């Protein structure tokens, strides 16, 4: 394996990102914690929070670790994270390896200040860009393509007036599926890839703005869902409100949502690009019943992701819906384990077969 192959093994990163900016100066670490807790299904390998105080010295404080959100953070740790602007991340990797150095958010200190970046997605040209950066003197501390994005944003910031311009220029160089939440002094920036493959949405609670991978995380902090960030859109949140830049957007016919968000990754109580995930799975089950009718006594879903689709299949086919599998609730999501061997062993202890005499 070369120095570059390890960042492209597998399909990339299906993570969860969350950002919060309280214009009145209240600490946001607890809100980010609850937002990440609501996004835990998107990543169980590591997590992190980085915050800054926009009214003070603007020093970035961060805490990252391997494990679930409630394993890495407790009240004492959250109390140390003083700041009214911050970003958070939960990670599931199929690339880059399980090590704390690969946990996000990434905090970059450079001549213009400090950036904290949380990234969900995968770059198809990560190896090429990383190679170019290393040959110009860049030294990488991680094996994830998120650091490639961070380097490009930091370098572009040297030649731009604003951080959002730097994000836009970086987007012109990177290719792939991504959603970004970036904090810089006194502003929070969200960006979505031009195809709209990875979700990102905006929420608001009183004078606090939020960015999140899914709307369920907005609801978890008692905020109001404002809207989705559009494919190719860059949103900049400051004390003056939300500014939008659509110059990277593609025509709507070129948008390409990730179907796996609706099938597996997203929570059923989330709505992505105007489509409720629960409803999408019901419709998928009905479509399957129309395309592939069967002679059976019972329709059974494999918990948890297959349960709603099975209900849709039952409704359309007229075959009763029932349970034939027992799920061990103490085992996490199995598909997002980093290794195939881990997934196989986890499935064995996660799913038990109930006694069932019907044809399923």
Language-model features and meaning:
Residues 1-231, 236-296, 302:
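Conserved short alpha-helical segments that host acidic/polar catalytic motifs at enzyme active sites
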Residues 138, 159-160, 293-297, 315-324, ...:
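Secondary-structure transition/capping motifs at alpha-helix termini
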Residues 148-161, 311-333:
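Amphipathic alpha-helical
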Residues 192-193, 309-312:
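A short acidic (Asp/Glu
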Residues 300-309:
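Glycine-rich phosphate-binding loops at beta-strand->alpha-helix junctions
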Residues 318-359:
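Short, glycine/charge-rich flexible loops or terminal/linker lids adjacent to PRPP-binding catalytic cores
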């Amino acid at each position: 394996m070369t120095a570059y192959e390890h960042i492209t093994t597998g399909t990339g990163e299906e993570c969860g990102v969350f950002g919060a900016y309280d214009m009145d100066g209240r600490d946001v670490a607890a809100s980010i914690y609850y937002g990440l807790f609501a996004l835990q299904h998107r990543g169980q390998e590591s997590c992190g929070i980085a915050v800054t105080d926009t009214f003070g010295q603007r020093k970035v404080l961060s805490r990252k670790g391997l494990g679930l959100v409630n394993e890495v953070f407790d009240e004492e740790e959250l109390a140390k994270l003083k700041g009214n602007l911050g970003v958070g991340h939960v990670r599931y990797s199929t690339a880059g390896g399980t090590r704390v150095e690969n946990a996000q958010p990434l905090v970059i200190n450079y001549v213009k200040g400090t950036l904290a970046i949380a990234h969900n997605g995968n770059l198809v040209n990560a190896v090429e860009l990383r190679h170019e950066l290393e040959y110009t003197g860049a030294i990488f501390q991680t094996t994830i393509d998120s650091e490639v994005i961070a380097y490009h944003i930091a370098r572009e910031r040297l030649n731009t007036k604003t951080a959002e311009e730097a994000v836009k220029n970086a987007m012109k160089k990177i290719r792939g599926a991504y959603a970004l939440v970036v904090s810089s002094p006194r502003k929070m920036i969200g960006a979505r890839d031009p195809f709209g493959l990875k979700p990102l949405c905006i929420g608001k609670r009183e004078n606090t703005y939020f960015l999140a991978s899914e709307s369920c995380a907005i609801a978890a902090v008692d905020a109001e869902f404002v809207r989705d960030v559009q494919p190719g859109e860059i949103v900049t949140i400051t004390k003056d409100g939300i500014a939008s830049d659509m110059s990277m957007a593609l025509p709507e016919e070129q948008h390409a949502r990730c179907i796996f968000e609706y099938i597996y990754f997203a929570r059923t109580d989330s709505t992505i690009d105007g489509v409720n995930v629960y409803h999408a799975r019901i419709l998928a089950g009905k479509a399957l019943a129309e395309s592939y009718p069967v002679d059976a006594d019972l329709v059974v879903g494999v918990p948890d992701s297959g349960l709603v689709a099975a209900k849709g299949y039952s409704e359309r086919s007229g075959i009763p819906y029932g349970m034939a599998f027992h799920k061990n609730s103490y085992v996490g999501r199995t598909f997002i384990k980093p290794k195939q061997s881990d997934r196989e062993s986890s499935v064995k202890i996660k799913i038990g077969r109930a006694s069932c005499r019907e044809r399923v």
